[in-house]
Amino acid sequence: MESGSRGALTRRWIIAAQILGAHLAIAAPTERMLFSYFRDNGKDGVFLATTEDGREFKALNDDKPIFTPPKWRGQNLTRDPSILYHDGIFHMVWTSNWTGRIFGYASSRNLADWSEPVQVRPFPDSLPKEDQPDNVWAPEIHHDPVKNDFFILFASTTPRERNDDDASNNNGKPGFRYDNRVFITRTKDFKTFSEARLYFDRGFASIDAVMKPDPARKNWVMIIKCSRDESLKTMPGRNLWLTRSSGMDSDKPDFAPLTAPIAGNHSPMFEDPSPRKSMAEGPSLLRHGELWWLVWDEPAGGHLQLATSPDLKAWTHHKGAKFPPRAQHGTLFLAPGSAVSWSR
């Protein structure tokens, strides 16, 4: 990138950071911390919880779904709901089934009345067969303060990756069905989406990528799940890893080497000591107040987990945190209390 482009990008980031800081200073007293999630297989819809103390999350809408699955043939689940509030609108994406080539999108101004759901197909039919996946999992929606657009990260296994026999997949043996990588699609209006492109590939099966801008260091922070079996000698997984980009250009992130695992197997943060039950997935990261907040799922152990950190290095694991029963893989997000219809 030329120096003039770098200077323009820096100026845009400074302006975005100033706007973000002003917004937090004004809105923080009236903001609510919310958590969207699903239960069981996702057939019942999207649920919503809130917290006043950051330790106990209570279900809203009398513990009933705030959004029910659209009746799409073969794509009628609402797993991994990711919600983002921006400029008065809640944007939501979700996994619509275990197999397929779409994810779902809908929007709302109050988390009660939703737009007509639409199917987003990030891989066009024009792509070669070996680049057409049969799964689109865990879409995570983000707003880019520099580009002033939105991007969705998600995981897919293409036949090309599955058949390369490099043993980078979940069980480390050639031919395993899933060898996910993280892809990206971008949009400005949620009507047209860019063609999916490979976004993060460090040579191992990965999923559940979530990113947040760090105003202090002027870069992006990513937390991602390594899907590989915890018993493998090379890159043992079922855990969460953290990395940072070199700057704020989300199209050219240039991520640094991964840290040691921060949650799940082979990490300092887990609840159940059994390797199979301490696996971590579905992270959600939020900056609120003076802390970073991290929620993740221990699906085999049956509990969501919560940790906080002032610097993304020293973590406090709040093992006593409470979430609604059977809550799974969701998203922490902030919104003005006046924008949320549900009071209980």
What are these regions (language model features)?
Residues A25-R344:
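Carbohydrate-active catalytic/glycan-binding domains of CAZyme proteins
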Residues W13-H23:
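Bacterial N-terminal signal peptides
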